[in-house]
From Swiss-Prot:
Coiled coil segments of this chain: none
Protein name (Swiss-Prot/TrEMBL): Chaperonin GroEL
Transmembrane annotation, as ranges: none
Any Gene Ontology CC annotation: cytoplasm
CDD domains reported for this sequence: GroEL
Amino acid sequence: MAKMLKFNEDARRALERGVNTVADAVKITLGPKGRNVVLEKSWGSPTITNDGVSIAKEIELKDKFEALGAELVKEVASKTNDVAGDGTTTATVLAQAMIQEGLKNVAAGANPILMRNGIAKATDKAVEQIRNASRKLSSKEDIAHVASISANNEEIGNIIAEAMDKVGEDGVITVEDSKTLETYVEFTEGMQFDRGYISPYFVTNTEKMEAEMKEPYILITDRKISAVKSIVPILEKVAQAGKPLVIIAEDVEGEALSTLVLNKLRGTLESVAVKAPGFGDRRKEMLRDIAILTGGTVISEEIGLTLEDISINDLGQADLVRVAKEDTIIVGGKGEPTAIKERIAQIKAQIENTSSDYEKETLQERLAKLSGGVAVIKAGAATETELKEKKHRIEDALSATRAAVEEGIVAGGGVTLLRAKKAVEEFANTLSGDEKIGAQLVAKSLDAPVKQIIRNAGLEPAIIIEKIIEKDDSKYGYDVLKERYVNMFESGIIDPTKVTRSALQNAASIASMLLTTEVLVAEEPKEEKGPEMPATPDMY
């Protein structure tokens, strides 16, 4: 395949056109008075969104060189989304401002490599200022404010705050479709996994079709149980203790299953058998989680334990185990709190070290189950289009809220970046030559988000920004919704520190890469051939 090449200034200008196309489409959504963008879908109804990364991903340009610039901006948005879950539009606006300012300097003869060094140093200085301005979340109201701003909706903010308050920092919160028009939150207490009873004969509540075991012993094994003789000794010990028994095993079948059912029907021993959750190594880890939560031991030949040898001390215990047809919930596991804490710390370390999204998701799920909380936000709306948009906003707000819990919050509305500008300008003056130019372009770009927020509200930025800077108070800013100067924290106009920091760092990274680009290489577009003419028959 033949390639096309572009060099020097031509290359950079083509990239800039691509950057501007994406950034101009994205930046109109910034702030509480930002507009929406309608995205055409090849199937189903169109999507209406104000989420920067969703809009950026949909844009594909015909010109191959401009498309390269567009891809770089998409990278800014998606990287910020991956790290912080929000701030994609802010990152895009910052990147565009840095690139436009940087290209002017490169065209005027500045050395891009030295400029890049200046950009990196100035970004570190700005991040330091952002961290200094950060404060920890102090209340449920703070969480609600962060979520409300990200979702642009107070009701969603309160629902997320309620969910996070119940499940805690390590709990899992998922978003599903509601069967009604209402948006609400459902909680699952304790550890839940998606395996139910092996036989309906174990049911104790025929109305709900559930087996409910109060203060049971829990036998946990990775083996298949089919011979009754292997479990008779432990069944006798549990029956003598006068408590019910829950068996979690790879499978329970044959005479072992019929003995358990028969004992249950005769009233000799209340019991229920459940298949172990997960598969392979994941199953082993989940069984260990259950064992640690309940204070039991996983009966496995790997550690030299057989079913015949176990004592009642090897069994786990809980306040309540509720088993339905398709899921099981263990409430109030009686494991050692220190052992549970150690297991949680171990899973957290694994989450930090894994690069696989799927692996991360399953580990977070296990973490939540051990921490004892799963919340499901049921999103309701009148139409499919509105539902899609609402779910998207809830997911974004959840990510932003987690980021806020992790690193704290700063004044929102672009004010924190604006206030970092002065320190970065002073720092730039300590540098020299083209490094200084690189640092200065970072300083100049720091007011781009606040300007865009004010413009999107139909107001003039210059006067408002001047008045904000006049007052030397990091909490002081402008509420574009109410059109007045306020204490940003008291008014609930706050952003997660992680979001603001990530947006700036990712924008600076992409701007540096683009400014140091000299050559573009792209594939030549294929010529589309028209349909061939059918052969005409010979004329005689």
